[in-house]
Amino acid sequence: MGHSFTGILLGFQLNRIEIYPYGGCSKLEYDINTSLKKEILVLLMGPIIQVVFVETVKHFFIMEPYFYIYHYFILCFNLLPIYPLDGGRLLNLFLAYLFSYYNSMKTVLYISSFLYSSFFLFTLLFTKNIIYIVVVLLLGINLYKEIKQANFYFQKFLTERYLKDYSFKKTKEITELKQMRRDYYHYFITEKEIISEKEKLSLYFSYFF
């Protein structure tokens, strides 16, 4: 609920909430080119609200220990650096401060795939609990979907920059579209001249229309 509430306050549109064994997933509609700080805030409010909820319940009610174990297990699981868990999304956003959108997304998917493979193998070898195995399988399915959608997200990132006018304080000179970063306006260095981001994207999309 923390994600949904914060996202709505920041102007994001809530499409739906999906429930998984490892927690709820708020499907918020917003631009990929939204401020990194805003998106990080939305993601952080999920676990923060969960901790506040559990500690409030602990203060006012007497609950079985299982209640607290379950909630904190879900919290820790959701913070694993595996996309599309909150931990994986946060890792992607922090990488976006260092690298281009394309490279940060590719990197987090590589890291997620490696960690998930190790996690899945560990689960098969040391876990007999069928529910836990199902949870891990569901996570794998969602990760696979994100990997398949990676190129679509990159095209959406470029399309937004072409169709909408964003205001960024930072600028950067680059040579190709895959070097474009979030929170930056770009100038492209060509063999003959330096052209603006809009001009480069106009040339790029002219091949499709």
Residue ranges of predicted features:
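Hydrophobic transmembrane alpha-helices and their immediate loop junctions
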Residues: 1-209
